[in-house]
């Protein structure tokens, strides 16, 4: 599942509108819509703001390399 689908699904589960998420995060509605549509390239900072509001955690892990 792509990160933008997770954001949208979680927002809906919490009963928030895109405008609510924009207001709480300090981001524009245009940015929220763009992220949820899978467009653009949001920064880690932007994703962190959204994740905090939605109760999500961003985890980075080392990719396994087949030898």
Task: Please place each PLM-identified region on the residue numbering.
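Absolute protein N-terminus
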Residues: 1-3
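Short basic helix-loop element that most often maps to the first helix and adjoining turn
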Residues: 5-23
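Small-residue (primarily alanine) positions within well-ordered alpha-helices
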Residues: 22-25, 51
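Recognition helix of helix-turn-helix/homeodomain-like DNA-binding domains
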Residues: 26-41
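DNA major-groove recognition helix of helix-turn-helix/homeodomain DNA-binding modules
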Residues: 45-60
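Short acidic DE-rich linear segments
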Residues: 64-67
């Amino acid at each position: 599942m792509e990160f933008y689908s997770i954001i949208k699904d979680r927002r809906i589960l919490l009963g928030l509108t895109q405008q609510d998420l924009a207001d709480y995060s300090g981001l524009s509605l245009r940015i929220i819509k763009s992220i949820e549509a899978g467009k653009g390239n949001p920064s880690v900072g932007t994703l962190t703001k959204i994740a905090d509001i939605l109760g999500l955690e961003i985890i980075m892990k080392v990719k396994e390399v087949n030898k």
